[in-house]
Amino acid sequence: MIEPHGPRAKEIVQRDCNIISPCLSRPYPLVIERARGATITDVDGKAYIDLGAGTAVMNVGHSNPEVSAAITAQLEKMAHGDFSSFFANPPVRLAEKLKQLTGYDRVFFCNSGTESVEAAIKLAMWKLRRQSLVGFYGAFHGRTLGSLSLTCSKIKHKVHFPTIRVVHAHYGYCYRCPLRLEYPDCGIECARQIETVIFKRELSPKDTAAIVVEPIQGEGGYIVPPPEFHQEVRRICDENGVFMVADEVQAGCYRTGTFMAMENFGVRADIVCMAKALGAGLPLGATLSSSAIMDWPPGTHSNTFGGNLLASAASLAALQFMEREDLGTRAKHLGDYFMTRLRELQSRYPAIIGDVRGLGLMIGVEIVKPDGSMDPDTRDRIVVEGFKGGIVLLPCGDSTIRFCPPLVITEEEADTGLDRFEAALKNLSLEK
């Protein structure tokens, strides 16, 4: 790890290393003290443009006044209402809001993305009385054992851990097609192989509860599939009596311009998982479905903190803010601006930037060697150079940098952040 920015940061990092479990991955020693909007300030007073939004969590911006006020007002009444045992208004209001935004009329609350996926897995297995799943190479759905079975982005996530039965298919990664085909002439063979290969040779659809898929692969590299990919997955689910589960944990809450990213592809899943931006900084996850599917009896599934009153109040305020401020339209507008600037940089640095892809403010920049192969080392150096220059960048996939700033980022902040990103590229290109 590089040297922390200042003395307070250095001291806190040292204490952290002495006490916190070493399993966490930190790309650089940023020690945050406060943040507002799209600006983070560290413990030594240095400010950074946040292009990561706490891993796509702070869509409404850090320290959003309306969210803060809602949390404070609820805290003065009660923090935890034991929603798994009793009743309360805040989580019910939140569920009603989610129904209005999505059309799903049943909601299960939990605390995180991985828990929302676990609930989706259990619901699909319970409803269809089947125990197997189909996932995708490059997917990330969490690190608890059920969701980890679906996760297939890095082997270090899975080594030594038992898993439930999941067969993985190829995702629609057209820039590096694993089947060495060309879109659109490929006929979406990656998705078709679920039916033509997996369901014929390895896993009967009669034993399959669900196909679980991200609208855009997140940790796998911010990979945007062609529209027909999800449409083909939907067809396969329909024709084989299998549920389609959409993991909207990272892509949801207007990040791609629509409340649910699957809307961009004209597809509606049977079960939806949400978290991250849903809680506006507080731990909150939700699993959504229809009343026809989510009809499991009391005691089938539960958790102590699901429907937490503070998280529910924060989420409702955040959703109301997103809707009123039309953050979906803003994400599309600023996303177009980011994509234009980043593609200009790609044309100037073709030996470093291989691909720019995204929807709304969920954008991936794939870093390559001059021969076009992945270059994770240079990717990591760019991320660190960005930190030194005052921007927060996050890696994903094998060789990609993600751009997922708060949806409230100003154009001036966006320009500053992109200028600093270009400076990082320039520094490394001069070294080469």
List where the protein language model places each region.
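Conserved N-terminal phosphate-binding loop of PLP-dependent enzymes in the Aspartate aminotransferase
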Residues: 1-432
